[in-house]
A protein has these predicted regions:
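Solvent-exposed, non-transmembrane regions of integral membrane proteins
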Residues: 1-235
Length: 235
């Protein structure tokens, strides 16, 4: 596991332009956690050491505390990977775009279809419509807004977000440049969903572990004194 961890960190560092030593360490740590967790489970069920039927029997008979620990450690590995990727490899693009123009980031193409004024219940908004494609996949639509509330005249920026298993896409529209264009901000934040998946796995693993009766701490049971009449009868 240690050799694979070091190799994984080295490959990650060499393949990604923006990688740093800290990011490579984070990915290596997540790989080490995951491999160690799987190796420990394999040892408990004697995988490749006993006949498959015996390993399968041990697999099915693992206590809840064991499954909870495995799930929690696996969740920690996933969360560390998500935290590292989202911190080190976020891609941001800020530019002025006109309707019909396209900007590419991280393999995604953002095409600004239109910008129009819309009326909300208590605000007016400038709404941009982006068509997003990747390769030959069907496009999706992101519609960020810049809102101005009627009474308070307060302005807010409403980002449009699309989540995938590999990361989140963000689109933000800003002020016009006076020449038919609008300031836009486009982001790709990788592996953000892994943070939530990892956190959920850790919480679920803790709950499963605590459900194991062997790990419950309860009040000592009270032993009943023998009935005096019964003692006399036996005597």
């Amino acid at each position: 596991a240690a050799i694979v961890t070091v190799a994984g960190a080295a490959v990650t560092y060499s393949m990604i332009d923006r990688a740093t030593v800290l990011a490579a360490f984070g990915i290596g740590l997540s790989i080490w956690l995951l491999l160690s967790t799987l190796t420990e489970l394999a040892e408990r069920i004697q995988l490749f050491q006993a006949p498959f039927a015996e390993s399968w029997r041990r697999f099915l008979r693992q206590p809840r505390a064991s499954w909870g620990m495995t799930l929690a450690h696996g969740g920690l590995a996933i969360a560390v990977a998500g935290m590292t990727a989202s911190s080190a490899w976020t891609v941001e693009s800020i530019q002025t775009m006109r309707p019909g123009e396209t900007v590419s980031i991280s393999g995604y193409k953002f095409t600004l279809r239109q910008v129009r004024q819309v009326q909300g219940p208590n605000y007016q908004a400038r709404r941009a419509t982006f068509d997003v494609t990747k390769g030959t996949n069907t496009s999706l639509t992101l519609e960020p807004e810049k809102r101005v509330f009627t009474v308070s005249q307060q302005q807010t920026t409403e980002a449009a977000i699309h989540s995938t298993f590999l990361g989140d896409l963000y689109a933000v529209v800003g002020d016009p440049d006076g020449k038919g264009g609008f300031i836009t901000r486009l982001y790709f934040n990788p592996l953000v969903p892994w943070l939530w998946v990892g956190a959920f796995m850790m919480v679920l693993g803790a709950i499963i572990s605590l459900s194991d009766r062997r790990h419950r701490v309860g009040a000592p049971s009270v032993r009943r004194s023998p009935d005096p009449d019964t003692v006399k009868t036996k005597a």
